[in-house]
Amino acid sequence: MARMKARSAKGKRVAKDTWKSKVWYNIYTPQSFGGDVIGQTPANDPSALMGRISEISLRDLTNEHSKHMTRMYFKVDGVSGNNAITQFVGHDTTREYLKSQIRRRRSKINVIIDVRTKDGFKVRVKALVLTAVRARDYHKTEIRVKMEQIIKEMANETAFAEFVHAMVMGGVGSKIYSECKKMFPLKRVEIFKSEVLEFGKAVLEVTPEAQEAVEGEEKQ
């Protein structure tokens, strides 16, 4: 019995610790979002990083506390040395925040529209208008048509990075508010979600910080 136990212990395979072989990579936002490090991620091989999505709040990205409810998503689409370069792929707004904005005796008008930017990016945009008082159906229809028109025009007239900035920082919402309040009293406008459906004329953005890090590694 003792011999059998000894043989069993001797023949047992030792599991390889793959975690120790992983390399940590810095995750950078695109240059249009500051080119900052937003986190780190491990991988056995650089190719394993491609397509990984990182999330960060817009508050942490811009240092604006009022943007705490917005989450930004960036996908790795290139690796330079130990640095992962990303592309913006969408944003959303927390459910808790959206629910807190809805009140009784107000109307909620939703719009979902696919638009294309000047440089060929196709983006799905979800917008919300809250009226100050309850609106009739024909008012809702008029506002919805105007919302779609404004979002489409702003996308068609601007490059992708500029349009994304206008979506998440309030430019698109402000334009909708100023135009639609002429039609009916409004309380709030939110561009609460976006998703990049097709990428256009994108150039891989190696940030200055990432380039410096790579050059430093090459000198060592």
Swiss-Prot record:
GO terms for molecular function: structural constituent of ribosome. It comes from the Archaea. Signal peptide: none annotated. PROSITE patterns: RIBOSOMAL_S3AE (PS01191). GO terms for cellular component: ribonucleoprotein complex; ribosome. Pfam families: Ribosomal_S3Ae. The keyword Mitochondrion does not apply. Keywords: Ribonucleoprotein, Ribosomal protein. The keyword Ribonucleoprotein applies. GO terms for biological process: translation. Belongs to the eukaryotic ribosomal protein eS1 family. PANTHER family: 40S RIBOSOMAL PROTEIN S3A. This is Small ribosomal subunit protein eS1. It comes from Methanococcus vannielii (strain ATCC 35089 / DSM 1224 / JCM 13029 / OCM 148 / SB).
